[in-house]
A protein has these predicted regions:
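Membrane-interfacial amphipathic helices and adjacent loop/beta segments
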Residues: 1-20
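Non-catalytic C-terminal accessory region of glycerolipid acyltransferases
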Residues: 20-164
């Protein structure tokens, strides 16, 4: 499955960055004015920031918020759900020759400058994009492909109160 997904992503011109060397490469892309897309629903381990996700504290990567703040980059939270063929541009096509249709749904656009002077901008931004992701999933739960343990790491009791 991983090889198939990698091949599909690379065939559209995307450069994939491995988790182990991501920070240096992501920093280079951002510093050069590039754009970065990330899967925001991954468990970040015990060092992540814990924010509510479907009512439970979830360890979430800080890098999205940190890089947005450092490079003054917008965070665009979006989903690409499949839509019925009759709603796509090929509405008059027959089922045999229709392409698969998708919609692009922008759920939130987060401006990091809005968080200047806040006591915990990383936590607040992380919570906001996680809430936006949750709304996208709730609209199309049948299309969400969950193959990992999102709540694998749980916070110590002091973090539980912060995430609730």
């Amino acid at each position: 499955l991983e090889r198939l997904v990698r091949r599909l992503r690379q065939s559209s011109g995307q450069t994939l960055i491995a988790k182990k060397d991501d920070f240096e490469r992501l920093t280079a892309v951002m510093a050069s004015g590039g754009k970065v897309a990330t899967l925001a629903d991954q468990d970040a381990g015990p060092r992540g920031v814990f924010v509510p996700f479907f009512g439970r504290p979830a360890s979430t990567h800080k890098a999205v918020a940190l890089m947005a703040l450092e490079f003054d980059a917008l965070i665009v939270v979006l989903g690409v759900p499949r839509i019925p063929r009759h709603q796509g541009r090929f509405a008059s096509a027959t089922p045999a020759n229709q392409e698969i249709c998708y919609a692009v749904e922008i759920e939130d656009v987060i401006e990091p400058r809005e968080y200047a002077g806040h006591t915990d901008p990383v936590g607040q931004i992380t919570q906001r994009y996680t809430a936006a992701l949750e709304r996208l999933i709730r609209r199309h739960p049948e299309q969400y492909f969950w193959v990992h343990r999102r709540w694998k790491h749980q916070p110590r009791s002091s973090h539980l109160r912060q995430a609730a």
